[in-house]
């Protein structure tokens, strides 16, 4: 798993709702560092769980993405959040 591969997965599967780390469906649920921290989603494990199982308006990606792809996208999201998107 690596962030570069995660970027490709993100662009293909996540960017429609989370372009540039935003939250197009729920503006309070962005992928910005402060929002990840406030929502307890600021670890690889927490993001992996969210992507795998979904929650609210976000669909589950279990079965659509491999475990390695989900791990990679989590690394990508954290890397981009640290850099301010």
UniProtKB/Swiss-Prot annotation:
Primary residence: other
Job of this protein: Functions as an electron carrier between membrane-bound cytochrome b6-f and photosystem I in oxygenic photosynthesis.
Matching Pfam families: Cytochrome_CBB3 (PF13442)
Binding site for heme c: 14, 17-18, 58
Organism per entry: Leptolyngbya boryana (Plectonema boryanum)
Any GO BP annotation: photosynthesis
InterPro entries: Cyt_c-like_dom (IPR009056), Cyt_c-like_dom_sf (IPR036909), Cyt_C6 (IPR023655), Cyt_C_IC (IPR008168)
Highest taxon above the source species: Bacteria
Protein name, entry field: Cytochrome c6
GO cellular component: plasma membrane-derived thylakoid lumen
Coiled coil: none
SS bonds (residue pairs): none
Subunit organization: Monomer.
Subcellular location per the Swiss-Prot or TrEMBL entry: Cellular thylakoid lumen
PANTHER family to which the protein is assigned, alphabetical: CYTOCHROME C6, CHLOROPLASTIC
Family: Belongs to the cytochrome c family. PetJ subfamily.
Entry keywords, A to Z: Electron transport, Heme, Iron, Metal-binding, Photosynthesis, Thylakoid, Transport
Any one GO molecular-function label of the UniProt entry: electron transfer activity
Post-translational modification: Binds 1 heme c group covalently per subunit.
Xref: SUPFAM superfamilies: Cytochrome c (SSF46626)
HAMAP family: Cytc_PetJ
């Amino acid at each position: 798993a690596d962030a570069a591969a995660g970027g490709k997965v993100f662009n293909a599967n996540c960017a429609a709702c989370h372009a540039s780390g935003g939250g197009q469906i729920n503006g309070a649920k962005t992928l910005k560092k402060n929002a990840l921290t406030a929502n307890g989603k600021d670890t690889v494990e927490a993001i992996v769980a969210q992507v795998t199982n979904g929650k609210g308006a976000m669909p589950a990606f279990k079965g659509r993405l491999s475990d390695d792809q989900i791990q990679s996208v989590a690394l990508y999201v954290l890397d981009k959040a640290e850099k301010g998107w």
